[in-house]
């Protein structure tokens, strides 16, 4: 793991906990049962159920270790408890005016919560990094592959992020 803090919203933390619970209490026991059944069928070298089951169990164990480490390092930050401010920090929901004239709303969340379909961007992404500490009404510059883009910040809110 890196030295970068693992900031996460309460919803993101619950999501990781739910996934860990699912893996530990449902998926892994099912795979163990399949592997035990397949092992009892004799020759394991050509036993597809056994080989697949062992591979899947390793994948699950790897994911369990990853989730456990991420949750242990997590620093839960609730955007709803932040005092009203027009300055952008982790957990902010920001409405922007892009160069092409379109408005876009993004939510600045933790690394484990990224979801572009819901406009959730990581707090260490290039866009979020140029927004952090800026205020409503400010204009920030984002370096993109197409060149520099000036972005106007229209609104900053700290609301619940699901």
Predicted features and spans:
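N-terminal cationic and glycine-rich segments that engage phosphates or anionic surfaces
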Residues: 2-21, 25-59, 162
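A general secondary-structure boundary signal
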Residues: 16, 31, 35, 61, ...
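Internal alpha/beta loop-helix hairpins
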Residues: 48-82, 86
């Amino acid at each position: 793991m890196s030295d970068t803090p693992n900031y996460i919203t309460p919803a993101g933390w619950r999501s990781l906990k739910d996934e860990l619970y699912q893996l530990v209490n449902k998926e892994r026991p099912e795979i163990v049962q399949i592997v035990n059944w397949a092992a009892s069928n004799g020759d394991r070298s050509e036993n597809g159920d056994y080989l697949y089951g062992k591979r899947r169990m390793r994948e699950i164990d790897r994911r369990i270790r990853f989730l456990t480490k991420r949750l242990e390092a997590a620093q839960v930050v609730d955007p709803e408890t932040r005092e009203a401010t027009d300055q952008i920090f982790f957990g902010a929901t920001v409405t922007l005016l892009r160069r092409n004239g379109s408005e876009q709303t993004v939510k600045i969340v933790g690394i484990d919560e990224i979801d572009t379909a819901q406009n959730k961007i990581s707090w260490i992404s290039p866009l979020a990094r140029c927004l952090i500490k800026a205020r409503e009404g400010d204009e920030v510059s984002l370096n993109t592959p197409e060149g520099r883009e000036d972005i106007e910040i229209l609104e900053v809110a700290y609301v619940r992020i699901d």
